[in-house]
Amino acid sequence: MHNSVQKNLNYKKYVIDSKLQYFKPHATKIEKTFAEEIRLSLTKNQKSIAPKFFYDKKGSALFEKICSLPEYYPTRTEIMILKKLQTELPDFLDHSFRLVELGSGASIKTRLLLDIFTKLQDRIDYFPIDISEILTESSEQLLADYDDLHITGIIDTYEGGLKFLQNFDDKKNLILFLGSSFGNFSPDDGYAFLQKINSAMKSGDLFLIGLDLVKDVQILESAYNDSQCVTAEFNLNVLSRINDELDADFDLINFKHHAIYNKEDQRIEMYLRSLVNQSVIISKSNLSLYLQKDELIHTEYSRKFQVSQIRELLTSVGFKIKNIWLDDGENFSLSLVSKN
C-alpha cells in the first residue's frame, strides 16, 4: 500500500536511515507565494500579514523565547496538563496507536507525549506533518533521545498530510494539535479546519487539541505585551523578513507593536501601528504601499474559549468528547475527542 500512496498522491519518499524517512509532494499547489500573499493582504481595506509568516529562523527563535517568559502562561500551563496526562492518557490508548503531530516539534510537549508511548509500546511511530523542512532537523534531535522511535515526516500542509495518512495504512492515530494555534483561525476557518480533521480521521483515531481559555483581561494582555518586549520584537520581525525576502524597505523604527484584548469577540488582537505617514516599496510583490499615521496592520488574532464553548464547538463538528483536561488555575485546556 505504501508504494501506491506515493504514486497516487504524487509523493516522493526520502529514506535518511532505518529510523527516519519523510515524504514530500513532487509538485504542490498548496500556497500562493510569499510575495503574492503579502501583496493581496496588504492591499485590503484592513491591511494584514498572516501569522504563519512570523516563523522564519529568527521568528521561531523569538517565539521559543516568548514561551519561557513569566507573563506567557500558555506554554507552562499546557505542560502542566501534559504532565497530568502521563497517568491519565494511557487509559484511552493501546499498543496499536501511532503519534501524529500537526507541526513538528522537538519541544518538551512532544517529548511528554512520546514518554507516554514508551510505556505502551516497544516501537514508537511518530508522524510529524509540517510544511517547513525544519521537520527533519527536529526529528534528528528526537531520534537521538528515543531508542525505540521511528519517524515518518510528511512535508505538506496539515490537510495534505492527513489525506496522505488516510491512505497510508490502517493503524490508529493519536493526532496532536498542541499550543494555542487553533485560536489564530477565524470562527469560520476554525470550524472548517476541524471538519477537515474529522473527515480525515478513521474510526478509532483520537484527536488531542489545545485551546486557551477566557480569563482576566490583565493576564491576557500581559501575555502579549511582556515587560522584556520580546513579543514586540517577534511582531516587528515579520517586517524584517519581508525586507530580506521580498526586497522591501520597511523602517522598523516607524512601527510599534500593539496588542489588546477584544472582550466581545474573546480574542487578543495583535497589530503593527504605523507611527508616521509613510510609503513602503515591496519590490518582489510589485507593491507600493502607503500607510497613514496610526494605521494598523493586523498580524494575529488569538481566540480564547469558555469550556462550554469548547464542548459545543467540538460536538457541532461531529466529534465525541472523551475528556477535557484543565490546568489547576483553569487557564488552558486539552481536549481529547474521537470521530462520532
Spans of model-derived segments:
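N-terminal auxiliary segments of SAM/dcSAM-dependent transferases
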Residues: H2-K52, S60
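Class I SAM-dependent methyltransferase Rossmann-like catalytic core
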Residues: Q46-D91
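Conserved SAM-binding loop of SAM-dependent methyltransferases across substrates and taxa
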Residues: A106-Q121
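A short, conserved alpha-helix within the catalytic core of class I
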Residues: N184-K196
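Conserved beta-strand signature within the Rossmann-like core of class I S-adenosyl-L-methionine
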Residues: S199-V214
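Substrate-binding/catalytic lobe of Class I Rossmann-like enzymes that use SAM or dcSAM, i.e.
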Residues: E221-R303, R311-V317
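Core SAM-dependent methyltransferase catalytic element
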Residues: S274-L275, L326-N340
